[in-house]
Amino acid sequence: MKFKWLALAAVLLAASPVLATDVLTFHNNPARTGLNDHETTLVPANVNQDNFGLLFNLSVDGKVDAQPLYISSVAIHGVGRRNVVVVATEHDSVYAFDADSGTPYWHVSLLSNQEVPSDNRGCGQVSPEIGITGTPVIIRESGNPGTIYLVAMSKANGKKTTVYHQRLHALSLADGSEVAGSPVEVEASSPGKGPGNNGSGHVIFNPADYKERAALLLHNNIVYTAWASHCDIAPYTGWIIGYHVNSLARVRVLNVDPNGRPSSRFLPDGSGNSFWGSGAGLSVDNNGYLYGLTANGPFGELSSNGFPKDGDYGDTFLKLSAQTLDVVDYFTPYNQAQDAAADTDLGSGGTLVLPNMATASGEIVHLAVGAGKDGNIYLVNRNRMGKINLKTSDNSNVYQVVVLGDSIFGSPAYFNGCLFYGGVNATLKQFTFHDGLLSTSPTSATTVSFGYPGTTPSVSSFGSDSGIVWAYENASSGNAVLHAYSALDLTQELYNNTQAPNNRDAFGAGNKFIVPTICNGKVFAASTNSVGVFGLLAVKAAQNVTQWVKVDREEDPADREDDDIAVKVSVTNTGTQTITGPISLVFDDLNPESYVLAPDGSTTTVAPTGSFYVDFTPASGELMKEQTETRIVRFRSGTETVQFHPRVLAGAGIR
């Protein structure tokens, strides 16, 4: 590995293909915490109607039901490296926009010749057309710059019949092109005699009967899809289907209603047990177990080991083996049959894998949480979920039940020992963990109520500080409303986009199940046919102090692995005045083959923009005359040499 300095420039190695500032999946991570704890720009002090608001709108060709995803420093074909937001629509389109300026880079339609998006299948839940509904997932390790995985529904109208398609697509982030082997038709079968069986002992996946409402999950090189019905229109069952990211070969299949039997008047044909979660995706823990909530449907007679003999799991909190997709544990409310009959299914919500917690006795517990229409928050011990209690009329077999009282159509968020839930026609509530137990009543709540379907909050912070809870409201006025609250106290609303006069921050009609994406100083919130991009308005730029500093580097040959290297980088104040922090070393003009590993952000205001920087602020907050501040910076490069120009910015202004 060779290094050379160019006039005020260094030749270093650059970064990881996956950066801390990416949002590559639903609710930020496979645990589905909804937390971005690397947000350095947006803090409670500057998120208000004077400093924060709508920057621009990204117009698209259909409804946006999927969460926008953010990819930093991605190599766009013919353009170079840019921060990009990916938007998918129900018109079967995928867009890549510049996340900082709104410039469109590419747009692809996933419709084959003579095809159109699916009709709504006689169901108004996703309407007027069905295309891409579930949030995609992005993997950067699969190539340079990476790959987007998503499911698209379409139809071909023939003279006598209409053929429906569900296809898994893998698209290059560089230009939206299909990667080798993409797309593949979604097909599956499962042993059973339940709804949709072929009369020969197998239930068949019929693409016309399903929609991919749940977000996709990526785990251990497998992309998992999970399937829901159209308005409970029979026949349908509960499918999870997994595909290998490289070959797109189907490698996992699970059906949790393979032998569905009528269990109530509400389910006359026994259909049910689907996965929809109001757009939430399956979650996964650090041990590789998957978690999900099923909707209304039959729950089978138990065998001696406590599992349903027929494999039917209605209204159930499932734990699945990633190796086989077998159900290895579960929790089902004792009154499951009544819940199914009353359409108060557990499957309207999503699961969240919580960090390890200590109880009052010092025991470390491994928890997950989920809630649905019945108004209860269920906390399960992932090691002993509790199965179902048929002996007594209670849920004493589960770790903890907290009565929320609000129906949940969405997912919670977790931050700093707190859980945030937003139910239907209810306030957004904060609950707090203590000694491994959740508070039985809210510790704070918003002053405004959210109508249908409630809200799925997201949180931004810098570590455990500067927490902001973001919540999307599908307002009764028909307009979309973005709210921001202090994560310390939800009664403190920092901002909502109706506060500014003259509709300055209006960004479109509201939509249900929308999750805001917060990354790198921006908030992306979908409306019916666009995505609003919010950020700081009147910005004070940081000062360029490069002329008053000296930047040195020293390679550490002992700390090298393949193309990775550790470099000691020093910034010395050679001027006559103290330099007040924050102080940032910016890596300008990086060649396209290079990355900076784990930067603290990228420039959005001080030109040139889009350059990554590393924080060099001393502990005292300022760099005194002749003082030197040193960091070990890791780099990676696809070439032998990497060139950049160092730039040093100082002060509290925006980079």
What are these regions (language model features)?
Residues 21-358, 363-389, 401-431, 454-461, ...:
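Mobile, glycine-rich extracellular loop/lid and propeptide segments
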Residues 625-655:
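Terminal connector regions
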Residues 587-608:
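Short aromatic-acidic-glycine turn motif
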Residues 347-348, 560-568, 580, 629-631:
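Short, solvent-exposed loop/turn segments enriched in Ser/Thr/Gly
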